[in-house]
Amino acid sequence: MKSIYNYDLKNLEIKLTKLGEKPFRAKQVFSWLYEKRVDSFDEMTNLSFDLREKLKENFVLNTLKLVKQQTAADETSKYLLECEDGALIETVLMKHDYGYSVCVTSQVGCAMGCKFCASGLLKAKRNLSAGELVNQIMFVQKDLDKREKRVSHIVVMGIGEPFMNYPNVMEFIACVNNDKGLNIGARHITISTCGIAPVIKRFADEMSQVNLAISLHAPNDALRSQIMPVNDMFNLEELFEALHYYQKKSNRRLTFEYILIDGVNDTLQQAKELVELVKSMNAYVNLIPYNEVEENPFRPTQPKNAAAFYDYLKRHNVQCVIRREKGSEIDAACGQLRANVEKQRSARR
Ligand code: SAH
């Protein structure tokens, strides 16, 4: 049965009307789901018994089960969740000085095959539904409710390529963004993509207030193609053409993510190429210390190289930060917890 978290307010109105209900009921149900955050239809006490029964016959609520939770000293918390079909996904909560953000998974596994990433080791299995995306936020929000805190920001930066699951990700955003629901502002939501150029343009047309982050990781086509096969589909020229289009439409500052990998993309020559590539954009560069993945040969850059790379960008007027690592002691990086649990499971089989 379909989870009711799959419906944004508009679609819930349509669905309830089809079930013979007045459209305003959808607002009441929405409020129970997202403001009062109940766990069952029986708790929706201002609805008639008949309507509650009808809801129970047609929908389920929570479809995710907690398999494992790990919390680090800095309050980063990682939830390993199991979907109804047994698929495992990871959701991460992070505390910042500006609030709490949740990093959601958009696909079970990933087909993009970036060489440095742990998610690719698991291959792509399927897209998550909009309801499974919303459910991840609700799972974490209900946990935060115990501390009377609220999810203020969302990053679609977990396992998967969100722009290969575009319609579901957009429905998810419409749902959490709704002011009758969680009311998380578009400007507090960031989608990260490895660079699916045509979808970036579509996104610019439809969701121009949502932030966009691009996983760049290399300053030229030769290197980028080596470590990110997506570059053979959409090279840097096509990617940047789409990004200029996005900036024209949205006027928003872009984020470039650049993982620093020892001896691969962390030289001063590469910093120079990176400056050339991004200097004409309204953007900042997030330099991210690479998180080691046991199964592949890449290692994090040396701190002195990271510092030199950062200084070079700064001196050439590229806005950038070296992002602090959060929760590395809990396998918080990119598919690592899930990969580790799957390894244990298959060892047991
Ligand atoms: N598919 C999307 C979102 C998921 S990956 C994208 O590519 O943007 C989220 C970010 O983590 C990406 O920038 C990705 O390149 C990066 N990443 C993957 N593996 C990593 C690792 N081992 N250490 C640090 N960052 C990693």
Protein language model regions, located:
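Generic beta-strand structural signal
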Residues: 77, 89, 100-104, 112, ...
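Short polar/acidic secondary-structure junctions
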Residues: 71, 84, 94-96, 145, ...
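Conserved AdoMet/S-adenosylmethionine-binding subsite of the radical SAM
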Residues: 141-320
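Alpha-helix N-cap/helix-start and coil->helix boundary motif
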Residues: 9, 111, 196-198, 220-221, ...
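Canonical Radical SAM [4Fe-4S] cluster-binding loop centered on the CxxxCxxC motif
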Residues: 95-138
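Auxiliary Fe-S-binding modules of radical SAM enzymes
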Residues: 1-89, 244-253, 260-349
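Residue-level structural signal for beta-strand termini and adjacent loop
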Residues: 93-94, 168
